[in-house]
Amino acid sequence: MWHFCEQVYECFEGYHRDYSVQTVPVEYLASHYIVNKFRPDPLAVLWLFCLGIWWEIIQILHHLFQYKEPALFVGSCQNLAAFLEKKYSMEVIQKEGLAASALKDKERLTEKAVVNQPLSNLIPHSNKMYERSKSLLSGLKRGLIKQKEIAFDKLMGGSTIDFQHIPTGTLTPGENKVLDIPIVPQHLLTSTNITDYHQANKKNANGATALHVGAIEVIMDCFTSPDSNICGGMLLVDTAHLNPDNAIRSVFVAPFIGGRPIRVLLFPDTLVEIAPNMNSRFKLLCTTSNGDVAPDFNLAMVKVNVAGCAVSLTRTYTPTAYLEQELIKEKGAIVQYLNRHTFSMHRNNQMTKEEMQKQRLSFRLESALTLQEKHPLHATFCKSTNFVYKIGGDAKEGSNGNLTVNESQLSSHSPSAHVLHKHNNSGDNEVEFSEIGVVVPGAGRTKAYGQNELDLAQLSLDDTSSLRGTALQTKLATSRIILSKTMVGNTVLREDLLATFLQDSNERAAIDLIRTHVIRGKIRCVASINVPENTGCALAICFNSGITGAADTDIYTTSSQDAIVWNPACEKAVELTFNPNPCGDAWNFVFLQQTKAHFAVQCVTGWTTTPLTDLALVLTWHIDRSLCVPKTLTISSAHASFPINRWMGKLSFPQGPARVLKRMPLAIGGGAGTKDAILMNMPNAVISLHRYFRGDFVFEITKMSSPYIKATIAFFIAFGDITEEMTNLESFPHKLVQFAEIQGRTTITFTQSEFLTAWSTQVLSTVNPQKDGCPHLYALLHDSATSTIEGNFVIGVKLLDIRNYRAYGHNPGFEGARLLGISGQSTMVQQLGTYNPIWMVRTPLESTAQQNFASFTADLMESTISGDSTGNWNITVYPSPIANLLKVAAWKKGTIRFQLICRGAAVKQSDWAASARIDLINNLSNKALPARSWYITKPRGGDIEFDLEIAGPNNGFEMANSSWAFQTTWYLEIAIDNPKQFTLFELNACLMEDFEVAGNTLNPPILLS
């Protein structure tokens, strides 16, 4: 029977713990006993059955007496709902009106004869977290007898504690509000007589000396409106540590709004020494996003629930599997109620194996002082022997982390020797160990030295880590550029290989730059110049991955990769941080030299007013702390953000009240330039591959004239050929841009809501803008341009990126598509199998019977063709999107499908006597072996189709004809027998889905065929 009572008590206690109510249904006891216990007592089961019958009778009487109108209690809640639905239907209300008792009936229907339960605590009970004795006596003592509050000096080890609703204080809005998280009620702590560990004896050896804090629940009852926008952040700080990496335990973010309280559950798993200051061990740092609370009101009331277990010298806590495998791993959580978004993060600063190998541990054992005679009239106290044991590598940063041991010689190791001591002159008997390991034999004064006192392997001479440190320690070079007082726009101030900018230097990190193999930090270029505000100009610093031939350095091409355009009259200093290897996460100096990475400093717009003297622009180069991140573009994949860096143009507005309107096309796949040649960059070439596109356009507006010249510009999207004479232009959705005194730049965004459909990337230049159906970006002088000095109001417009980029179809391209400068996680849909023409070659017709052979070589990446001296070759190179991309993309990776069509003259099949051999090679050396060969002997020609996989050493990317890693390119060598019959060769190309590009190469203008 005692065993049965103990089981009933455990059921009673478990239900009270799980459901937080004061009464326990007998059905729960019976079901729990019958299901969970395999050998029930029949008498006990009969007793529970009778008790259950009485319980049902009591519940029925409770329901009957609760309702004042017994007629409403019709069998069940379903009948009640049906009754009310029939009584208060919409038709009845429209005819008879709403009864006065409708709200009461609705309240009864909502309650359904069940009283709402209060909001319960979420902290687990201590008996769920700690194992404890399950004897009947201890169970009755814990549950049936109300436990009194015990002072901590009488608390025994192994005892569990549960403190509810410990008051903490109130929280006021603002930053850095600190609250102590009490672990025990303060009145218990102050009445405790704390004893020291060393004073423990047999009588009080089981007395609690520490408290293991298993769980803390912080409850915040907010006094704010439930619909307010106040958001709060909380840091749980352990003040036993000084290092923030160890002190900050958890971070919580939640809305501080009224309604249900904020409940933060913490599982510190921390042993706290019982001491007068133990309640100040944990602190909660709170801050709010705004202080929208009146001064006379508090933000919230805070209270704490704690569960833990006492620890003594002889007894410790035993965690349950729930605590060890679930709660400790979870570390903490914050309750997320409906329509509340919360966030929690937990810090982990545990030492890794590599960090442990870098630690230095030193052990020093000093002997007692002994009186030693110096001379007959003088004696002093000295240490006869000392022991020093050191573990760890070099304390300096960058050590290899190997463990080393240095041990002094002990007198006990060699009876005839003693450790050599060097006493300093101060007489404080401190021993210097500069000659540890030097042994003096007792019979003489001969010195003996060990042979391997220094381990060369520990010097870390093979350290390959990247450059790091402060800006001074990582300073690579300084460049000084003179700006003439007569400087005009479109002037290149200095351009050169990036390696040339960096190598001529005596700065601290110059040698490290040249001798380091792998550098993972970005390059940071800081440009500074002082320009008076009554003048102004526009300067640009630009980085590109490569340069070919007599490349054009127009701002359209140079600013397409990594660049910044600024007005030094508004911004005295700017910085450009970039990754010189867009395909990888590291680089080095030789890489910059052999890939021909290019850097340019140029003037976009000249002086507004002429300065009295020349000026100096200073560039300082550093290794930035931010790591290099690859930046590549996949042709067939969607891009959440497409970094286009498209220079849209320079807009000039004369001073005065006259209306001035500028137009910039958004069909941006046609490049820039004139009618006979175009300029192209890599991002624009990628755009031109697609037939149609749309997205969110982000423009950067830069002021290029003096800050003293003022104007307000309205930007809007419109179709057709709009002129200044048209009225109501600002009826379009528009954005007004008005620069402050020292503001040099701003950004504006036009989302997809401005555009009904997508539009073409390229438009024929012969099509009137009124009929092209493509949007344009217009800039209208809103009020007037005016100043106290002469000069126009000049701004530069640059399309930074296209967000939520969507593209449709593949574009074969146009010759002479509309160019720049006409003025007064999205889905990619691509049509595969669409080819772009690359080039067409017609053989020379001057061949004779004696010279019946011709050959030519074509570079597949650069689209350059060279023929032999047989005669005049007719060569046509098409500026198609794929051909342009292969030229301007510095790094390429993936598969290209080529189609070579060989056409013959119209001769009889019996008269056909021509053939062609085609070799695919990657080097023009006569020792290079072909990768593939074809022979065509069919009458009147034929065609071949082949896939070419571009794969290189830089994370799979290849740079054509680069000295770095001896990278070559791909050629077609075509030898023709009887070129009078084989007359025409055409090459088409199609990019496959895995094709990727990175970086921009500066090229000469591309001639239109």
From Swiss-Prot:
Gene3D superfamilies referenced in this protein's UniProt entry, alphabetically = 2.60.120.20
Q: Which UniProt keywords apply?
A: Capsid protein, DNA-binding, GTP-binding, Host cell junction, Host-virus interaction, Inhibition of host innate immune response by virus, Nucleotide-binding, RNA-binding, Suppressor of RNA silencing, T=3 icosahedral capsid protein, Transport, Viral immunoevasion, Viral movement protein, Virion
Offer an example of a GO molecular function term for this protein.
DNA binding
Q: Where is this site: Cleavage?
A: 451-452, 825-826
Name the Pfam families on file.
Como_LCP, Como_SCP
Site feature Interaction with the viral RNA: at which residues?
468
On whether Hydrolase is a keyword of this UniProt record, the answer is no
A biological-process GO annotation: transport of virus in host, cell to cell
At the top level of its lineage, which domain of life is listed? Viruses
Is-annotated flag, keyword Ribosomal protein?
no
Q: Where is this region: Involved in tubule formation by the movement protein?
A: 387-393
Q: Name one GO cellular component term.
A: T=3 icosahedral viral capsid
InterPro entries linked to this entry: Como_LCP, RNA2_polyprotein, Viral_coat
- Entry protein name: RNA2 polyprotein
